[in-house]
């Protein structure tokens, strides 16, 4: 049975970020994606200039009311939220999550708590980080912070893999069943590898892959693709190990393809066959 995912995050007309990055790879893995855009920008913000607008929070609710009106909301298997244009959008998204779960009690809420990295040019509105700590975290079934976001959510420093597992379990105690730490960075075992953790109350899986060197300008949207693919694989019933291994390899294929084509924007279409069937393999280790 094909899974239906309501994906509520940013959209760029040119290039790949938010839904513009994740939607196609998720579909390539066999999911129906219902993209609902929190912002519509000309391009992602790391170019330093862009045009477009943040959607009014009521717009998100109105679109979902339309889906409910044609009696299709019960077919939604999960809500995915990513980049928010405002904290008020977050409150409306939680209302949407409640509405979806009322229609389908088995539906999951996957929160990608994008909180911004000013040094990278990723900017979020005031109040968004606080929204995730107070409201997004306890409402989520699955949450996918990077290291900086993990530290904000658990409200203390995380310096190594063991501390990251403990921090993930602190989050689990507040609501979610699954935590993906999308990028361990300085808390990982090795500075020259890209490492991730997938943690539940009683399991923790670690994986690493080579870093792909893009020089000064790292492509945007890698986390969005990672979250989207992870949600698809979880909904399809893969084990935690299978999920982590496939997602890591698929994202690596996109990165390698992008680098080989000497592009800055993620080359998700060019890499599509290797998203579905990666040529590389990375083994996850149970901690």
Curated annotation (Swiss-Prot):
EC number, as in UniProt: 2.7.1.35
Binding site for substrate: 10, 45-46, 224
Keyword ATP-binding in record: yes
Protein residues bound to ATP: 112, 144, 149, 182, 209-212
GO BP terms in the entry: pyridoxal 5'-phosphate salvage
Any matching Pfam family: Phos_pyr_kin
UniProt pathway: Cofactor metabolism; pyridoxal 5'-phosphate salvage; pyridoxal 5'-phosphate from pyridoxal: step 1/1
KW Transferase (keyword) present: yes
Catalytic reaction equation(s): pyridoxal + ATP = pyridoxal 5'-phosphate + ADP + H(+)
GO annotations of cellular component type: cytosol
Assembly behavior: Homodimer.
Function: Pyridoxal kinase involved in the salvage pathway of pyridoxal 5'-phosphate (PLP). Catalyzes the phosphorylation of pyridoxal to PLP.
HAMAP family membership: PdxY (MF_01639)
Protein name: Pyridoxal kinase PdxY
């Amino acid at each position: 049975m094909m899974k239906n995912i309501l994906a509520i995050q940013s959209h760029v007309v040119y290039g790949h970020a938010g839904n513009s990055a994740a939607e196609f790879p998720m579909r390539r893995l066999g999911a129906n994606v219902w993209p609902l855009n929190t912002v519509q920008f000309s391009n992602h913000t790391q170019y330093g200039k862009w045009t477009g607008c943040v959607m009014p929070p009521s717009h998100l609710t109105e679109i979902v009311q339309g889906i409910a009106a044609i009696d299709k909301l019960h077919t939604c298997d999960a809500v995915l939220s990513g980049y928010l244009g405002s904290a008020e959008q977050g409150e409306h998204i939680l209302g949407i999550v409640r509405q979806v779960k009322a229609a389908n009690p088995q539906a999951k809420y996957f929160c990608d708590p994008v909180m911004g990295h000013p040094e990278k040019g990723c900017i979020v509105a005031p109040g968004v980080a606080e929204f995730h700590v107070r409201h997004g975290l306890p409402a989520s079934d699955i949450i996918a912070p990077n290291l900086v976001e993990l530290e904000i959510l658990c409200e203390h420093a995380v310096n190594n893999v063991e501390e990251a597992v403990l921090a993930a379990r602190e989050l689990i105690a507040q609501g979610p069943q699954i935590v993906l730490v999308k990028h361990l960075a300085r808390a990982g075992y090795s500075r020259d590898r890209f490492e991730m953790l997938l943690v539940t109350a009683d399991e923790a899986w670690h994986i690493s892959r080579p870093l792909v060197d893009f020089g000064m300008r790292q492509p945007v949207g890698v986390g969005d693709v990672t979250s989207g693919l992870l949600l698809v694989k979880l909904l399809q019933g893969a084990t935690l190990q299978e999920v982590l291994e496939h997602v890591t390899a698929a994202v690596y294929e996109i990165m390698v393809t992008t680098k080989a084509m000497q592009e800055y924007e993620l080359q998700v279409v060019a890499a599509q066959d290797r998203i579905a069937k990666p040529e590389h393999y990375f083994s996850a280790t149970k901690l």
